[in-house]
């Protein structure tokens, strides 16, 4: 809960996993201090509020280290079951929802999700979920993107060239994403659901280390 904001309607846009960790720490401290009043430092964590019209969501792109044992030809044939694929002469920055760019073997491809894998569910309908549920997990074997070391994430602010650079060094495959919208974010929150990991790259971002506060001496 937050104080002094009256009837301002608030939604958490980022840092869900860090907030959950802070809650776990707070609950643990409460167990250790059964006489807590609610005013102790461990009952709070730092947050910042922005008006939604001043926030910009950029895509959170993906890079993958291998093709899970598939050859390039086998991999493309496999994903053609769920996506329409078109080779592109230029880098692909998706212009529409359910559209993805794919960089593989120094070539860009445009992927479009087939209608039968689209969903009206506020979470499963997100582009990050479409890619995860229909390609990253079933084809590449990436079941948990939070912990799988074969996948990494690149903020959209770093551009498409960064994806190409990664594929020339430690990765072989990259996906450029269409950014999640504020409306989609609100729909997930209003449904009482959680956003998938690495769904959004928010700007502006606060500098790290602006505030440091000890919970206990």
State where each predicted segment sits.
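Short hydrophobic beta-strand that contains or immediately precedes a catalytic carboxylate
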Residues: 11-14
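Single conserved hydrophobic/aromatic residue that forms the stacking wall/gate
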Residues: 1-5, 9
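Charged substrate- and nucleic-acid-binding regions of tRNA-handling and nucleotidyl-transfer enzymes
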Residues: 132-217
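C-terminal catalytic or substrate-handling cores of phosphate/nucleotide-
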Residues: 72-141, 151-171
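Short beta-strand scaffold segments in enzyme catalytic cores
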Residues: 47, 99-103, 210
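Short active-site loop/helix that positions an aromatic residue
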Residues: 17-32
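A conserved active-site cap/scaffold subdomain adjacent to cofactor or substrate pockets
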Residues: 36-90
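Short mixed-charge
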Residues: 29-41, 147
């Amino acid at each position: 809960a937050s104080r002094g904001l009256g009837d301002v309607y608030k939604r958490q846009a980022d840092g869900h996993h860090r907030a959950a960790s802070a809650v776990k720490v707070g609950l643990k401290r409460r167990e250790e201090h059964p006489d807590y009043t609610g005013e102790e430092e461990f009952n709070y964590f730092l947050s910042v509020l922005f008006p939604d019209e001043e926030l910009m969501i950029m895509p959170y792109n993906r890079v993958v280290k291998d093709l899970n044992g598939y050859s390039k030809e086998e991999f493309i044939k496999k994903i053609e079951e769920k996506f329409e694929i078109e080779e592109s002469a230029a880098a692909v920055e998706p212009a529409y929802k359910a559209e993805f760019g794919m960089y593989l073997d120094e070539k860009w491809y445009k992927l479009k999700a087939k209608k039968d894998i689209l969903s009206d569910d506020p979470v499963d309908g997100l582009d990050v979920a479409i890619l995860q549920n229909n390609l990253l997990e079933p084809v590449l074997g990436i079941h948990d993107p939070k912990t799988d070391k074969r996948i990494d994430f690149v903020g959209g602010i770093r551009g498409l060239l960064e994806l190409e650079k990664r594929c020339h060094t430690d990765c072989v495959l990259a996906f450029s994403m269409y950014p999640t919208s504020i409306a989609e974010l609100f729909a997930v929150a209003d449904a009482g659901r959680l956003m998938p990991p690495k769904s959004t790259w928010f700007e502006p971002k606060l500098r790290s280390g602006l505030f440091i506060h000890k919970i206990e001496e």
